[in-house]
Amino acid sequence: MEKEEIDNTPTPHNSGRKGDFAKVCLMPGDPLRAKFIAENFLENPVQVNGVRGMLGYTGIYRGVKISVMGSGMGMPSIGIYATELFKFYGVEKIIRVGSCGGYDPELKVFDTLIVQSASTNSNWAKQYELPGDYSATPDFQTMIDAYETAKKLGIPTKAADVLSEDNFYNDVNPEGWKKWTS
């Protein structure tokens, strides 16, 4: 007996339907940045999500179907949206785009980073019962493609390790960031 496929769309966090999202989805944190990307870089963008103000669009970029959707702030927020995109909407690759803060005094505003690993002080990943601490790394080919594309376009890049935190303001240990940069 064949297992019946259940269409779990829309979800409580996404009004899109199966097929509304491309295989590749760009994810800035800010939903208004997603709107900007859609309106300025995609041909014929269609808004596919607006639940809770988290804007998502699908359109065409250089002949390729691409989606872009905000993720919100923090791992719990991107965790919800990314999980649903992968699990229910057929997205195969999410590329995080957007801004970030920095602890390294050599990094400047508007520097383009090619992230090679992402550490965290969050306990969000504990639910997966991985042994030890987990430092997420990108798909190697995607990272190389991003680097090569930036190089071809003359965009200087910096390889970087990043830290994602659950808190934006750390009043408890304001100097704690120094340990992450040593």
Name each model feature, range by range.
Residues V91-E92:
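Short acidic/polar active-site loop segments enriched in Thr and Asp
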Residues P105-V109, A125-K126, V172-E175:
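Short acidic, glycine/serine/threonine-rich loops at helix termini
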Residues K108, T112-Q116:
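Structural signature of FAD isoalloxazine-binding scaffolds in flavoprotein oxidoreductases
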Residues T137-S182:
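Active-site rim beta-loop-alpha module in soluble metabolic enzymes
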Residues T83-F86:
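Glycine/small-residue-rich loop that forms an oxyanion/phosphate-binding "nest" at active or ligand-binding sites
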Residues S117-Y134:
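Acidic/polar active-site rim loop that often engages polyanionic ligands
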Residues M1-G79:
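N-terminal short beta-loop-beta anion/metal-coordinating cradle
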